[in-house]
């Protein structure tokens, strides 16, 4: 039966955009920002540490960050629609 692969995103900052083609062989390219010179690629979670070391050693890579998408809590507790508050009566002063 088909098993879903655990994937993780890497944000790779480059010195030059022309080097983006050299990084694509490490994973699946998701996004390339030519203006800000970074890539987002997805790799298998089990291969993360090995590929992270390999990519960090490349001379044309400025910085590599691991995506924090897995750390975000997606369970929203409570009702997102809020009821309007009823006006409260002011205490009488006298």
Curated annotation (Swiss-Prot):
Compartments it resides in: Cytoplasm
Keywords for the protein's UniProt record, in alphabetical order: Cytoplasm
InterPro entries hit by this protein: DUF2129 (IPR016979)
Ion transport in keyword set: no
Superkingdom: Bacteria
Pfam families found in the cross-reference section: DUF2129
GO CC term (a single one): cytoplasm
Family in the record: Belongs to the UPF0298 family.
The protein's name in its UniProt record: UPF0298 protein SZO_03600
